[in-house]
Amino acid sequence: MPASARERRHAVLAGLVALATAVVVSVAAPAPATAAGTWTETGSDRADPLTESQGLASVEVPANSPNRYTGIGTIPVGLSARGWNHVGDPDATYGGYYIEPYQRDSGNSKMFRVQAPGGTWSEYVHTLGPDEALNNSWAAVSPDGQWMLSGEWGTMTRLLVFPTPGANPSTSPSANLPQTGTVRLDHAVRDVQGCDFSGPTTLLCSSDDPDGSLFGLTKPLLRIDLSAAPDGTDVAGHVTALRQLPLRSSCSGNFEAEGIDYDRRSGVLRVIVVSPGFCVLTDSKTYKFSQS
């Protein structure tokens, strides 16, 4: 998201956490009729506003690993001190590389922080292209582990393709992480906060679109069908809006759709939706879906 909006949300979160002493009981309203689709809501868990409000990833290696979450409270102090003050929606390869996307408020680069299967951390920096946006909202690794997709904030008709940092042998922390290709979308998308592969050529994405003019609904769950599995070159992408994400809270105001994860082992799709106002503390949710 843009730096100014992020700073306002971070300030609100910090203030609310410091002041919150009462428990607010959430009263859920029914989902809107337009929310019907191929993915059916099956449950939800509370999303902690500091440590679970930006993204999530299921991790297969090592075995029995817990799900990983990101939020302003998960950013290491050392990274924040160097200006990397926003973390987006992470992903992990099936072989155990875990990847977090980071951005600064200014500059000409974005960074991916990678934990190898053995536990060591490395940083891979990408220098922005001439027309590339600064933000670094999410990372989605192809099922073969070799290619990583990322996106840009705003209204876009493309996704960016990189070699997967750490997992792809062509990458090195000491060298620039290059963009090698582009996914050319046949329909514009807006404010995509996360994507994850559900198959070799299929992405599921959470959009924070507040306007609704692109697909006739706000905050949509999107599917992007690629013309071929990522191989580092350009591919086409066909975009479909599947349904509106749940927007339920005790508070009224602007919701924020955040990260997304598809767990191939269980077939469960999870999406974080942050509640408005004070309810960011009490009834922000990670919603669960199954395909019907």
Question: PLM ranges: what are they?
Answer:
Residues 52-56, 87-89, 138, 194, ...:
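Conserved beta-strand position repeated once per blade in WD40 beta-propeller domains
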Residues 44-68, 85-89:
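Beta-strand-rich domains and repeat architectures in extracellular enzymes and scaffolds
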Residues 187-238:
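Loop/turn-rich, solvent-exposed surfaces of beta-rich toroidal or solenoidal domains
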Residues 69-103, 123-127:
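Blade-loop segments of beta-propeller domains
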Residues 44-51, 78-83, 126-133, 183-188, ...:
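Surface loop/turn motifs at the tips and blade-to-blade linkers of beta-strand repeat domains
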Residues 66-70, 105-114, 155-164, 211-227, ...:
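Structural motif
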Residues 35-50, 69-75, 242:
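A short helix->beta-strand "capping" segment at the edge of beta-propeller domains
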Residues 1-35:
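Secretory targeting and sorting signals
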